[in-house]
Amino acid sequence: MLIADIGGTNARFALADTDAAGFSKEQTLQCADFPSVEAAIQHYLDDIGAKGPDVICLAAAGPVVGNHIKVTNNHWVLTVDDLSDAFATDAVRLMNDFEAIAYSIPVLGDGDCLPVGFPEPKPLPEGDYSVGVVGPG
């Protein structure tokens, strides 16, 4: 599975295994060096010697509208259809970068967190709960 974090300046790509935690072959590319996300992905795949991915999951800075994201402070427009066509896969997921951060919260360990301010942090409850993510943007 190809995963990416796409911002206004950088696109960070990696490969992930759907059966294991973590990722490999991480690489950061400058968005301005490529005319499209598809061109950047192809460069990344060529550079690491990988074939086209079966699954693509991209998190980007910008709102998801229908099946596309216009990346904030970047000339790229990500669309499910263009990515599906370019890499011959129907398994394409686009999400906002803060949505991706929220999905990571349940798997964070104690060493992944740094308390800021007061009160002292409490462990997350088991089960379903609401998550809020605060940051710039």
Sequence positions of predicted segments:
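A generic local structural motif
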Residues: Q42-Y44, V80, G117-E120
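Short beta-strand-loop/turn "lid" adjacent to the catalytic site in phosphate-handling enzymes
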Residues: G49-L94, E99-D112
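Short glycine-aspartate micro-motif
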Residues: M1-D5, V55-C57, R93, S130-G135
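A gly/proline- and charged-residue-enriched helix-loop-helix capping module
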Residues: Y103-V133
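Short, glycine- and charge-enriched coil/turn segments that flank and shape catalytic ligand pockets
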Residues: T18-S24, D46-K51, L124-E126
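Noncatalytic linker/hinge segments flanking ATPase motor cores
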Residues: F13, Y44, V92-Y103, V134-G137
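Short glycine-rich anion-binding loops that position phosphate/pyrophosphate groups of nucleotides
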Residues: T9, A61-V64, P136-G137
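Short glycine-rich, Thr/Ser-proximal phosphate-binding strand/loop in the N-terminal lobe
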Residues: M1-H43
